Every structure is written in C-alpha cells, then in structure tokens.
C-alpha cells in the first residue's frame, strides 16, 4: 500500500500542479486532491500520511489540523510567519522553481516512517493549541 497524501485547496490548477510535482518528487505515493474541507471529510476513511492545505482553509479549520502539525504543510502565496511560528511547515508557492523543489525535498513526510512501520494517521480533532495560540492564528 502506497502512502496517501492529501491536497486541500480550492484552486484546481494549484491542485493539479502540486499533485504532479509531488509525484515527481516522491516515489510511490498516492495523491488525492480536494477543493474544500467537506469533500475531504467525506473521503476521510483513507489513511493520509501528509496534508498540503491552503492557508485560508487551514485558518478556518485549525482545530482539525493542530494535532497533525508535523504532517501538515500550509500552502501559501508568500511567506506565512503565523503558521510557521505555530509549528506548521509552510510551502510558499511563489518561490522560484528551484527553491520550491528544494523546500519540498526538505519536508519530512512523517508518513514514510509510519507507513513503513504499519502506523498511519487519520484526521483528528483533539486540541493541542492554547486559546491564545489559536487567537494568534486568527
């Protein structure tokens, strides 16, 4: 069974491009794209090992991903310090191609280790951020 990655972004072109790049960068992964959280949640029976989430969607659904920080990469246009300070990986899609690819290669897909050892994660709703930290993100 190949590791499953999720891209949650309302921009269809961005989804297609990132899926193609992920297939090029990571061998033997399945990549699923979703335009919103509702479609993602309807398909959440899959065991995703990493999530690439649009910054606006993550902002609105921070409670769903805060326990999955190591497995979540925020897709942003430009640097997004509020999410990186909160412990999320941030992928600035406005970077030059070489820098963007380098950043993707550095992202540690927690999933690889877990999938190779029989553990996988599902979306959880447990809370780890304090109310103050949540306010900073909002």
Where are these regions (language model features)?
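N-terminal regulatory/sensing modules of transcriptional regulators
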Residues: 1-118
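Helix-turn-helix DNA-binding segment
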Residues: 116-138
